[in-house]
């Protein structure tokens, strides 16, 4: 601000930059990283012998990255108006490498080719799922939706409802209202949900836990695509029927 007041003290900064969670380190050129982990709100590692402090952020339509190399008195902030993390990584690494004396390389092409390959692999998986769903619909595969619809709760995420509207089944989160979409039969004990907001890129599996009578008493989730943003945390949810 105009008064140049510190947001936090040096002692608080040092505490934030202490490792709390260990993350495996990839010790390979050009950075030859020896340690990797998470502090209090910051990723911590070393690049070519220098401590690196960083974090990313994002909302729908933009992603950002902040990178600090204190020993070089270097700070890099990249703000974007798109959703591809490789963009800010390419910019950050290009600047960082110039300070570290690393020969320049074409990060844009490198990451473009890597993403293209990853997307092609992920697309095969998602296409198989939705092709199967379409075939099930065409073949009029019968599903006992009455035993599935109801209200379920995860202790962390809160309540969701599976309900029938005009012959279709819908998923609705109470706490996160945008997590809403139509539910389809995929395989025995396995439904899939297609979110109304396609920009999520996070359609998900619903795995059913049934009692002896065939009534669904629990639901677990998993993203269909391996490229789904990790922050959805579907794999950590464990819904139990409450109604």
Q: Which stretches of residues belong to each language-model region?
A:
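Catalytic loop of the DD-peptidase/beta-lactamase superfamily, centered on the K-T-G motif
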Residues: 1-243
């Amino acid at each position: 601000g105009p008064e140049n007041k510190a947001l936090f003290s040096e002692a608080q900064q040092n505490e934030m930059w202490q490792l709390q969670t260990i993350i495996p380190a990839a010790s390979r050129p050009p950075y030859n990283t020896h340690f990797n982990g998470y502090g209090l709100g910051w990723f911590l590692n070393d690049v070519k012998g220098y401590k690196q402090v960083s974090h990313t952020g994002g909302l729908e339509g933009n992603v950002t990255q902040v990178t600090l190399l204190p020993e070089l008195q270097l700070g890099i902030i990249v703000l974007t108006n798109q959703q591809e993390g490789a963009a800010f990584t390419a910019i950050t690494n290009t600047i960082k490498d110039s300070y570290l004396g690393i020969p320049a390389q074409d990060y844009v092409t490198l990451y473009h080719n890597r993403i293209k390959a990853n997307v092609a692999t992920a697309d095969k998986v998602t296409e198989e799922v939705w092709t199967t769903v379409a075939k099930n619909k065409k073949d009029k595969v019968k599903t006992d939706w009455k035993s599935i619809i109801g209200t379920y709760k995860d202790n962390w995420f809160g309540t969701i409802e599976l309900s029938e509207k005009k012959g279709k089944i819908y998923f609705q989160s109470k706490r996160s209202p945008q997590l809403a979409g139509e539910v389809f039969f995929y395989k025995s004990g396995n439904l899939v949900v297609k979110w109304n907001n396609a920009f999520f890129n996070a359609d998900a599996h619903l795995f059913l836990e049934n009692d002896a009578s065939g009534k669904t008493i629990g639901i677990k989730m998993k993203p269909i695509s391996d490229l789904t943003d990790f922050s959805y945390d579907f794999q950590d949810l464990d819904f139990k029927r409450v109604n």
